[in-house]
Amino acid sequence: IARMGQWAENVYFGKPCGLMDQLASSTGGLVFMDFRDPAAPLVRRLDAALPGYVLCVVDSGADHAGLTDAYAAIPRELGAVCRLFGAEVLRQVEEAEFYRRLPEARRAAGDRAVLRAIHFLGDNERVSRQVAALNAGDFDEFKRLVVESGHSSFEYLQNVYAACDVEFQGLSLALALAQRALDGCGAWRVHGGGFGGTRAN
């Protein structure tokens, strides 16, 4: 089901998306995924009790129209970083090696690509800590890491608004309002591919 969903987005809608959202939707619940082998990702449903908490996916009202190029730039730029390391995906790149060769990566792929890679490498490590927090029943730590991931996405992945349309930032505003409402008691972050659309609270 997930691969069919990815095909529909790639071919029918022309969006060069990966498989993460489709795998999460087809599996259901909280899901751990590892894409070290893109042809056979590891998918494990997490058994976490979250009493008193609700996951809300909020429509920010932002429009995705005309933003395919902004979205497509992410895998294209990350691909340039991967090629430098002889990797198919960033999950196959060791973080220490990436930072050791950072000047080379900047020359090969550009600063925005390097910042985006920093987000992905950080999120790969952050996911392990999120799973550990859930397994330990430490939901406060899990929420903190969700917010940390969201800030990394905004600052380094740069997928909350498109540089070609800075006047309209519905998702940025939605995230600011979510932080105002939930700070100290909840978590929030961009959801999906970004550039408008939804946030998860």
Question: Which positions does each model-derived feature cover?
Answer:
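N-terminal pre-core extensions flanking Radical SAM catalytic domains
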Residues: 196-200
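C-terminal nucleotide
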Residues: 24, 29-189, 201
